[in-house]
Regions:
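AMP-binding/adenylate-forming catalytic domain of the ANL superfamily
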Residues: 129, 501-523
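Structural core segment of the AMP-binding/adenylate-forming
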Residues: 46-47, 77-143
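Conserved AMP-binding/adenylate-forming core of the ANL superfamily
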Residues: 19-62, 66, 70, 87-92
Length: 539
């Protein structure tokens, strides 16, 4: 299997006028995408940055993010996602951990870059995206494009790397090391319309992309979450590999009206989102527009995919009331995409929450290494042997823990616990690292959150444990409610008790104006724990 850049170059040659990237209402063809990226690659090469050198992407969504990534791939360098919410210490840690030699950064983040550059001894090239005053020692992205001819194409390898830094739930961010060839295996679903497996050569991949274009089956996806997040990052690589197009939104905070306008303008076929943080405002905007007699045009949209967090049955049902769509609820992580899925095709009665069909290469394994039998009631961790990264960069201990070899088979086991039902489906319980131990019972926050969020007055919720002399820990729900909601704490707890066992229900309801989430829509349990401690005085 080849490097992504080699495939994308072939696609650009084969379908040069097709759309490759869109940002808001603007778009770039494959010809433009390849040419601009090749010029950036020339600048990287001129700075002496090449094979296995790390390139940080401290950027918001936009053309520049995808071009910088393509450019790094072209030179066999390793692009590294950098969370744009990181402040100086977090930024310095990641850049030094990665041994980053180049950094693309947004102009609004220049002050943070200035604060850390002297702490990053390997950093030798800084490229500023956006107008405004240029950071001393940096170069403007647009000047870089204008001053370089496209870099010549070179031989590459499928063993070249892509780094996906994951914050996880505890500790410093870690880079998951993905060889291009391994990650390409996860694109299987995008080749199903052709009835073929994932191509393993540039020629086969380009031929498949051309056939998808000829049959009008090319995927045009809107990456709703930031590209620096695993969901958008991985799906964008997969879609571009098939000759499709990736669209992003220009607003720095999520704007559902803008999303639906971009879907209609570019005739997008797929949305990639992250659960309820996206679904709720999207549905509210659909309802508003419909009530105003100006419904959004969903005619091109075929599928909505969510990954990374739980996606409620209620939201799925409401989407299906607007259009008969395919709803794909995928179970995966930065370390293990495609562990399972829950598919709903146009029938609201099928919509479920947190119940998934296991992928062909995924099993549930107990902590002592046994495979969980269906209907046994045992809990185990999801283990995927199909698509497995090399490990974590500079962390052999964590690599050995997360990617063990069991009975001669290497698995990716990030830590998501589940039970296996009699019919072979799994019920996701949550990540073990944030589980709550109350009276000897292990309680997973996602279970409790989903029970509470099923109440119409609850906007969002995080559940955390607080210390307790009798029980060890208690369950505490930090939640936000709809304006004007008058429901009592006791009624909320009673509602949760209709969905989950009594011992899992919250001891305390802690009300906040809004629940803080990351830009990728994922729960910020550090914030939730601190908030719960401040409200209760317990720590």
């Amino acid at each position: 299997m080849p490097n992504f850049a080699s495939i994308w170059e072939g696609v650009a040659d084969a379908v040069p006028d097709a759309i490759a990237a869109a940002h808001g209402l603007d778009s770039h063809s494959w010809r433009e995408f390849e040419d601009r990226s090749a010029r950036v690659a020339a600048a990287i090469d001129a700075a002496g940055i090449g094979h296995d050198d790390k390139v940080g992407l401290y950027l918001y969504n936009g053309f520049e993010y995808e071009e910088a990534q393509f450019a790094a791939f072209k030179q066999r360098a390793v692009p590294c996602n950098v969370n744009y919410r990181y402040l100086a210490d977090e930024l310095a840690y990641l850049l030094t951990n990665a041994d980053a030699k180049a950094l693309f950064f947004d102009v609004t983040l220049a002050d943070r870059v200035a604060e850390v550059r002297d702490r990053c001894p390997d950093l030798q090239l800084m490229i500023q995206v956006g107008g405004g005053e240029l950071l001393d020692g940096a170069v403007h992205y647009d000047d870089l494009l204008a001053s370089h001819e496209p870099a010549p194409r070179i031989e590459r390898s499928g063993d070249d790397l892509w780094f996906l830094y994951t914050g996880g739930t505890t500790g410093n961010p870690k880079a998951v090391m993905w060889p291009h060839a391994e990650l390409q295996k996860s694109a299987e679903a995008f080749y199903r319309p052709l009835g073929q497996p994932v191509p393993t050569t540039v020629e086969a991949a380009v031929a498949a992309a051309v056939e998808l274009h000829d049959r009008n089956r090319t995927t045009r996806v809107l990456a709703g979450a930031p590209l620096m997040h695993g969901t958008s990052g991985i799906v964008s690589l997969q879609v571009l590999m098939t000759g499709g197009a990736v669209a992003t939104l220009p607003s720095r905070s999520f704007d559902a009206k803008e999303l639906w306008e971009v879907v209609a303008h570019h005739r997008l076929t797929m949305l990639a989102i992250v659960g309820e943080a996206f679904s709720r405002p999207m549905l509210e905007e659909l309802d508003r527009a419909k009530a105003a007699g100006q419904p959004h045009d969903l005619s091109s949209l075929f599928q909505i995919m969510s990954s990374g967090v739980m996606w409620s049955k209620e939201s799925k049902t409401r989407f299906l009331e607007h259009k008969k769509l395919t709803l794909l609820d995928t179970l995966g992580s930065s370390e293990s995409p495609g562990q399972g899925s829950q598919l709903t095709k146009g029938d609201a009665e099928q919509a479920k929450t947190a119940t998934f069909e296991l992928g062909d290469t995924t099993v549930v394994i107990t902590d002592d290494g046994r495979i969980v039998e269906p209907g046994s009631g045992e809990r185990g961790r999801l283990a995927n042997r199909g698509v497995v990264p090399l490990g974590y960069f500079k962390d052999e201990k964590k690599t050995a823990e997360t990617f063990p070899t069991i009975n001669g088979v290497r698995y990716s086991i990030p830590g998501d616990y589940a039970t296996v039902e009699t019919d072979g489906t799994i019920t996701l319980l949550g990540r073990g690292s944030v589980s709550i131990n109350s009276g000897g019972e292990k309680i997973y926050p996602e279970e409790v959150e989903e029970a509470l969020k099923s109440h119409p007055d609850v906007i969002d919720c995080n559940v955390v444990g607080l210390p307790d002399e009798r029980w060890g820990q208690t369950v505490n729900a930090v939640l936000s409610l709809e304006d004007g909601a008058e429901i009592s704490d006791d009624d909320l707890i009673a509602h949760a008790r209709t969905r989950i066992a009594a011992y899992k229900t919250p001891k305390r309801i802690l009300r906040v104006e809004s629940v803080l989430r990351g830009p990728n829509g994922k729960a910020d349990y550090t914030w939730a724990k601190k908030t719960a401690e401040e409200i209760t005085g317990i720590s």
